[in-house]
Amino acid sequence: MESASPAPAQAGDPALARDVKKRRTFAIISHPDAGKTTLTEKLLLFGGAIQMAGTVKAKKSGKFATSDWMAVEQERGISVASSVMQFSYGDCVFNLLDTPGHKDFSEDTYRVLTAVDAAIMVVDAAKGVEEQTIKLLEVCRLRDTPIITFINKLDREVREPLELLDEIESILKIHCAPVTWPIGMGKRFQGVYHLIHDEILRFKAGEENAGQQFESLQGLGDAKLRELFPLEADALLSEIELVRGAGAAFDLADFLAGRQTPVFFGSGINNFGVREVLRALSDWAPSPLPRDAVERTVEPTEPKFTGFVFKIQANMDPQHRDRIAFFRVCSGRYSPGMKVRHRRTGKDMKIANAVVFMANERQRSDDAVAGDIIGIHNHGQLQIGDTLTEGEALQFKGIPYFAPELFSKPRLRDPLRAKQLNKGLLELGEEGAVQVFEPFADNTLLIGAVGPLQFEIVAHRLKTEYGVDASFENAGIHTARWVTCPDAQHLAEFTKANSLRLAKDVDGNLVYLADTRVNLTLAQERWPKVAFHDTREHGQLLT
């Protein structure tokens, strides 16, 4: 076991510290159809990154959401890959990571959430807390990620706001601190009252211009209140009194510790409430946080460059058949042409042409600091979980594989395309789209996923990106576990006795394939010295 080493002495670079302080790296999480993609577009609109929702700046055509760039996403209207978008607003530089919106893609979503310092949770005001929201909040809670809540679609027929807050608190186990409060709902939605600024923002449907300033009134005592909202004024006054009396006021320390979420109400499709969320991110969300490595904790303002790969994306540009490693900078400053140490292999590599993103649009990055996400052109040498440093032996922690819940075997329409099939599956496996296993008893690669849609996505990408027409059939496997044993002889005996149920993963780790839950339980009872793991760290060779 490696002993913890102290952090190296820091030279103290005021310019670096200033740049790091400006960064806000966050994700947007929600259940499918709660309005996550719309909010993503509107934040980019307010940040000046795009001119109108659905189109990248300077593009003359294309109606797809900026963040849904992959062909299969455009066809199906769901987010299946994680886009990265950088934009500025005020004095801050925002790195927005758009997570997959479909329930099948929890593993990729988890990896994205390891790379952020805060999150916006979007809740559909008509549906409240949904299944995917619960799962994502559990992931955020593992790292005490600060969460801002945006309750969306107030211009539709929705549930009572107090009921929604109670549901968030009781199901998600996080305290709510309302920052804005709705005035009416559905067709009678009139705007919101800002509890901290003592200001009423009046709603007007159909405003698509980010520069639009919604009409405002100063405070609940404004003489125009009853004139403008004759049907809602009394209810608003009583609700605000109730909220202030029973609800918790916003507390920055509780928010940063992940114990409290500030809550905003609005309508993303109409830009209403978006500016307030963006200002909250700017004012309250943390700048890049320290990161835990196996050896020590790395501070974001340390002068030496460090970071980790949290995602591999193949064929972002089909014309160039490229692969990009998404890399979270944890300390120091990136500059083109710099030499870094690849921790897993121990080899040095040069990063000459890193890029920054706007979904699939990219441009060369000439500078990046902690919190920034850069793309590194990758020809197979980088894997998810890899750490790069300026020489120090560090390995960042916290990017796991989960045991798949579904398993399939590929079936080729054309047997002569077997080489292309294997190449495609291995590359998609490295990317994290699926997990790929090589069974001891069969030459056919085995594919593991956390949801059935992943197999459809892989089949589509094999066809469009690798020219392989393949279908997938059930492999008859219930679950998988990574196995380790400190006794080499005992492990050899286990391997010999269970060879028909064993496979290797992409990193060469031993995996036990159980066709039923009973089979797994029996194996654990028969081999008590063997450990069966349902997760492992990326890039980790289990021993």
UniProtKB/Swiss-Prot annotation:
One of the GO biological process terms: regulation of translational termination
Lineage: Bacteria, Pseudomonadati, Pseudomonadota, Betaproteobacteria, Nitrosomonadales
Location relative to the cell: Cytoplasm
Family: Belongs to the TRAFAC class translation factor GTPase superfamily. Classic translation factor GTPase family. PrfC subfamily.
Domain tr-type G: 21-289
Function: Increases the formation of ribosomal termination complexes and stimulates activities of RF-1 and RF-2. It binds guanine nucleotides and has strong preference for UGA stop codons. It may interact directly with the ribosome. The stimulation of RF-1 and RF-2 is significantly reduced by GTP and GDP, but not by GMP.
Domain of life: Bacteria
Classification via SUPFAM superfamilies: EF-G C-terminal domain-like, P-loop containing nucleoside triphosphate hydrolases, Translation proteins
UniProt GO cellular component terms: cytosol
A single MF term (Gene Ontology): GTP binding
InterPro entries given in the database record: EF-G-like_DII, EFG_III/V, G_TR_CS, P-loop_NTPase, PrfC, RF3_C, RF3_dom_3_sf, RF3_GTP-bd
Keyword annotations: Cytoplasm, GTP-binding, Nucleotide-binding, Protein biosynthesis
Name of this protein: Peptide chain release factor 3
Annotated residues for binding of GTP: 30-37, 98-102, 152-155
